[in-house]
Design a protein with these regions (language model features):
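Conserved G1/Walker A P-loop phosphate-binding module
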Residues: 1-80, 202, 224
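Conserved alpha-helical scaffold flanking the Walker A/P-loop in AAA+ ATPase domains
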Residues: 59-64, 93-101
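Helical mechanochemical/support elements of P-loop NTPase systems and associated helical scaffolds
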Residues: 20, 46, 59, 71, ...
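Canonical P-loop GTPase G-domain recognition
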Residues: 2-13, 145-197
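Intrinsically disordered, low-complexity repeat/linker tracts enriched for polar/charged residues
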Residues: 196, 201, 206, 211, ...
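Flexible beta-alpha connector loops of hexameric P-loop NTPases
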Residues: 78-88, 144
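Conserved C-terminal guanine-recognition region of P-loop GTPase G domains, centered on the G4
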Residues: 96-165
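Hydrophobic aliphatic residues
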Residues: 41-45, 99, 162, 184
Length: 225
């Protein structure tokens, strides 16, 4: 499998980098299993720290995919309301700036809990991404925590909403990871190293990201989202 290397961590608008390589952003509700998925993709246990407390990731983390040479960009989780109004506005501005102006952003990988019906915040973020001109790659997480019938129903719901078939994954069981890697490679526009490995003008949508779609207070380390 490819190797993931954490190269950059961004906290403020002024720190946003101009990385001249393809990027795929990873986004999802707090406690959707984003950090666990990063670790499963990396084949490691602690590349992204996992916490039982949702809403802890407060940074944008750039993971370099080697040797394919593109980035997975881990965005802060949203939907866990323990932050001041000013903090929510600050983080909304950071995410809006990144999603709407990054020329090398290929797609938004939207992580969705297999156990839940489509949620308002997920729908709002998918709408914002589409307004930015971004493709959406839906990823169902925690597939091991529901039945096959429930997974199929959820996948059908999101496919109908987004017009894209979701990838179905379980980080704990490592299922769907190789297939997801292939899909990420294809989305980034780079070839895989082996069969085993699994410039557009910026558009700023009117209204921006709803303030509810923001990370919340917690530690600055990359933790479970």
């Amino acid at each position: 499998m490819p190797t993931l290397v954490l190269e950059h961590t961004i906290y403020t608008l002024g720190q946003l980098l101009s990385v001249e390589k393809p990027q795929i952003a990873l986004a999802g509700r707090s406690n959707v299993g984003k950090s666990s998925l990063v670790n499963a993709l990396a084949g490691q246990k602690n590349l992204a720290k996992v916490s039982a407390t949702p809403g802890k990731t407060r940074s944008i983390n750039f993971y370099h995919v080697e040797p394919q040479d593109y980035y997975l960009v881990d965005l802060p989780g949203y939907g866990y309301a323990r932050a001041s109004h000013a903090e929510r506005r600050s983080w909304a501005a950071l995410l809006e700036k990144y999603l709407s102006t990054c020329r090398h952003l290929r797609a938004l990988a939207l992580l969705l809990d297999s156990r839940l019906t489509p949620q308002k915040l997920d729908l709002e973020l998918s709408h914002f991404a589409r307004e930015c001109g971004l493709d959406i790659l839906p990823i169902l997480t925690k597939a091991d925590k529901c039945t096959q019938r429930e997974r199929a129903a959820r996948a059908a719901e999101w496919a109908d909403i987004l017009g894209v078939k979701p990838s179905i994954t379980s980080s704990s069981k490592k299922s769907g990871i190789r297939e997801l890697w292939q899909r990420l490679h294809d989305t980034a526009g780079v070839p895989p190293v082996s069969p085993e490995d699994g410039p557009t003008q910026a558009v700023v949508p009117q209204g921006g990201i709803p303030h509810s779609i923001t990370p919340q207070s917690g530690s600055s380390s990359a933790t479970e989202e």
